[in-house]
Amino acid sequence: RSCEICHNVGNDCDYDYVQECDSPEDQCGTVMLEGSLAPFSVRTIHRNCFSSSLCKLEHFDVNTGNGAYLRGRIHCCDQQKCEGRPFPGLPLSYPNGYVCPGVLRGLFSDSSESEAACKGDETKCITIVGYRKERFLGDIAYNIKGCVSSCPELILSNRTHEERRNELIKVECRDAAKTTPSE
């Protein structure tokens, strides 16, 4: 299988090329990412070869606290070029009494860990640590912690670190802590 490859800031690619996929990356896909550290946000698009297990994730939304979040939409297909799915508006939700550690390191310079107040149906804490190897940018390390509504099934890879690959080092998901109201 061959897939279109591109990485760009915004919602579309200014450039692209086609690359043969290596096993186990057997599907073409597009990942749309949106990261926010209030009041700033940035969207990026990534077209690449993906494993079908990553394609099953479809979307994720991580509340990292203090108005910061990371969300992604994953769309895989059988064509070389998969169109990205648009982001829905952010839901209006209120704190629900659960808390998690929160950090968004690697995407923004302010990456100190804090407490994330979970909102709406967020009752789980997630930690994702890894890096992305990029041909032009070098390695992009990331450490993401925050509240989520459910735990994704992400599998760590034992493959060698190949060019332009996303390498997960740590994925943990657990129940969030319930805060006790102060009197």
Swiss-Prot record:
SMART domains linked to this entry: LU (SM00134)
GO molecular function, one term: phospholipase A2 activity
Major site of localization recorded for this protein: secreted
Keyword Signal: no
GO cellular component, one term: extracellular region
Highest rank taxon of the organism: Eukaryota
Pfam families membership: PLA2_inh (PF02988), UPAR_LY6 (PF00021)
Residues in coiled coil: none
Subcellular location(s) per record: Secreted
Disulfide bonds: C3-C28, C6-C13, C21-C49, C55-C76, C77-C82, C100-C125, C118-C147, C151-C173
Tissue expr: Expressed by the liver.
The entry's keywords: Disulfide bond, Glycoprotein, Hydrolase, Phospholipase A2 inhibitor, Secreted
Carbohydrate attachment residues: N158
Xref: InterPro entries: CNF-like_PLA2_Inhibitor, LY6_UPA_recep-like, PLipase_A2-inh_b-type, PLipase_A2_inh_N, Snake_toxin-like_sf
Role, per record: Phospholipase A2 (PA2) inhibitor. Inhibits the enzymatic activity of PA2 of Deinagkistrodon acutus. Also shows a wide anti-hemorrhage activities to D.acutus, Naja atra and Agkistrodon halys venom. The native protein is more potent than the recombinant one.
Assembly and binders: Heterodimer of subunit A and subunit B.
Family under the similarity heading: Belongs to the CNF-like-inhibitor family.
Name under which the protein is recorded: Phospholipase A2 inhibitor gamma subunit A1
Organism of derivation: Trimerodytes annularis (Red-bellied annulate keelback)
